[in-house]
Amino acid sequence: MKEMISRRSFLRVMGLSFGAAMLTACNTGTADSPADSPAASVPDADTPVPFLTEDEFPRLDGSTACIPLMAQMKADVTGMDLLEAQTSITVSTTAYAWENFGLWSRSDSEDYGAQLLIVYEAPEYVKEELAEADAKLEQKAIGRDALVFIVNEENPVQSLTQQQLRDIYAGRITSWKDVGGVDSPIVAFQRGVDSGSQTLFKKLLIDKGDGQLMAAPTELAPADMGGLVDSIAEYNNSANAIGFSVYYYIDQMYSKPGLRLLAVDGVTPGNDTIADESYPLCNEFYAVVHADAAPDSPQRKVYDWLDTDEGRRCIEKAGYVTLSVTPQA
């Protein structure tokens, strides 16, 4: 059964119990002595301290795989219930989020466009559009994810090298037997050119080789990540298919029975191997504001907050890999 919202990320509501004990006063009319009064509740040091109202919270956009983080941010920054925050988050996906933010929206707009992006890297054609428009954006890396490859659990192949993956997607390796599997054709799924995962696929794998990439027919290039996962699982009831996604999405947001992740160069993707970058196909994701966002604007406050201890705890709480903090010299 599909699991559109993982229990490990979306249902991590920090349900803090403030047991306020109401003491019934005696009929003597005397006040409680300090010794008789209940001890004051001491907030947990890790409990987020809200600093914006729900109405003040900046409008967000970004990548599909960042939706759980956006919801956790909104809950922590405003104090609203996490489940309620989840229902308020929608995104236009990676490429469109960058285009809309860089080309159309303004930092001083009261009612149009996003004010803050939480997003994966932009496709090259979008970077070119932003450069041509001289878009003034400020961005910083706030976490790390990875490009991962998905196969049917019945496929005996456990690991592929980066070069084997390049050869598969260039059409030079066409049978699983050539990489230690059975004598069956390899059916290699991709994503559309405007997707965040396709951008990482080209940057981290294809462009580090000879750049050769076979064109994928429409039926092998689903429009969304969920469609790709479904297609790999359901393709011809066989173990021939391979595809890719970002680790967080497949691990936390859209898991599906019958699939598993391949190791790459012998390293299995996971939070630990992504954190220390021993898994070879890692990349960062970003927070982005307009460069002219005022210091006291809600979007700038949230952007800066992501660098604080509370902000990093928020990222971790949502299940993402945070970046190591380098001490200042």
Which role fits each region the language model picked out?
Residues 38-329:
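Exported/periplasmic ABC-transporter solute-binding proteins
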Residues 2-18:
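N-terminal secretory signal peptides and thylakoid transit peptides that target proteins
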Residues 24-25:
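C-terminal motif of bacterial Sec signal peptides marking the signal peptidase cleavage site
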Residues 29-34:
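Bacterial Sec signal peptide processing site at the extreme N-terminus
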Residues 1-2, 119:
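Intrinsically disordered, low-complexity regions
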